[in-house]
Design a protein with these regions (language model features):
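Nucleotidyltransferase catalytic core that binds NTPs
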Residues: 2-243, 248-254, 282-285, 300, ...
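An anion-binding catalytic pocket shared by soluble metabolic enzymes
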Residues: 278
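A short, polar/charged loop-to-alpha-helix boundary motif
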Residues: 199-201, 290-296
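Conserved beta-loop-beta connector loops within the AMP-binding
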Residues: 257-263
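Short beta-strand elements
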Residues: 260, 268-273, 282-284
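Structural motif
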Residues: 54, 264-266
Length: 322
């Protein structure tokens, strides 16, 4: 459903628009993005559209979440196309601020979370990344005052950070996790996939193939985290161009690494191709094994069916860590 899209350029414009909606008794949904929108982003807007009276999506390549040597300068930007996507999906407004509007001269306040949630995995691989994420999300929540905000599960650690931030700061916003979306070949959708060469993309399919192997093993009764991780690594090691950064089974809320898997825990993966860094995740017992058309060795591994494996009804209790 296409509709007129209001363009907002400053936090003050966003705040005033949200106040008008709320004064009229309308619920507000926020979809934060960095642009280069794909089907995963579309799914977030659709979810917001279905649940909220008004939807605003932000398009902002946030410089504070990029570290030295990362891809800030070359991150894909396609504003005209992104605005068309938002209009097609029925968003009511797009918040497209300049860097100077979000971080005016003299601003010295940042937001950060301390502790294990932000120290491992992405926090270790990208120092300062989550401080940048937390700061920009806090600013968006303050300006938009949404009833709900929608985040994809692919960035699972970011989702956990944002959920904790929203609760700790008493923002009143409900953080809604939305399922990861995969391309037809099984690769998790990401704006950075545009960096991949055809050969790199082919080898990157080892990531969803590894997750599929672990999901099937879990469905068959495997609970030892080391053995599940080994199944994933076995697939990844078939891709000579993929440098593995981490594979782990974690609690989805705290990101504590687990020795024993249970239903609802996540397997998280990160690896680096010469042209792009890739992350992926799967919720054990909830997410169906990714359907992968061919493995990274070219050996023609049969496509994995997208239905849960036999035994799924007997998956164990939800994951929890005290």
């Amino acid at each position: 459903m296409s509709r007129d899209l209001r363009l907002l350029r400053t936090p003050e414009e966003l705040r005033l628009q949200s106040e008008r909606w709320r004064a009229a008794g309308l619920s507000v949904g926020l979809v934060p993005t960095m642009g280069a929108l794909h089907e995963g982003h579309r799914s977030l807007v659709r979810r917001a559209r279905a649940e909220c009276d008004r939807v605003v999506a932000s398009i902002f390549v946030n410089p504070t979440q990029f570290g030295p040597g990362e891809d800030l300068s070359r991150y894909p930007r396609s504003l005209e196309g992104d605005l068309a996507v938002l209009a097609e999906e029925g968003a009511d407004a797009a918040f497209v601020p300049a860097v100077e509007a979000m971080y005016p001269e003299g601003a010295v306040t940042t937001v950060g979370l301390r502790g294990p949630l932000t120290e491992g995995f992405e926090g270790a691989a990208r120092p300062g990344h989550f401080d940048g994420v937390a700061t920009v999300v806090a600013k968006l929540l303050v300006a938009a005052r949404p009833d709900t905000a929608y985040f994809g599960e692919k960035d699972a650690q970011q989702l956990a950070v944002v959920t904790r931030l929203a609760a700790d700061l008493d923002t009143g916003a409900r953080i809604v996790p939305c399922p990861l979306v995969r391309d037809a070949d099984g690769l998790a959708l990401s704006s950075r996939n545009a960096y991949l060469s055809p050969e790199e993309r082919h080898q990157a399919l080892a990531i969803p193939a590894g997750l599929a192997a672990a999901a099937r093993a879990f469905a068959a009764g495997e609970r030892d985290a080391d053995r599940l991780v080994a199944l994933v690594r076995d697939r990844l090691e078939r891709s000579p161009r993929l440098a593995v950064e981490y594979v782990a089974v974690v609690d989805p809320d705290t990101f504590a690494e687990l020795a024993e898997a249970a239903r609802g825990c996540r397997i998280v993966v990160a690896g680096r191709m010469p042209s792009a860094r890739l992350i992926d995740t799967l919720r054990l017992g909830f997410d169906a094994p990714p359907a992968v058309a061919v493995d990274a060795t070219g050996a023609g591994e049969a496509a994995q069916r997208s239905n849960p494996a036999p035994g799924a009804a007997e998956w164990s209790r939800p994951c929890s860590v005290s």
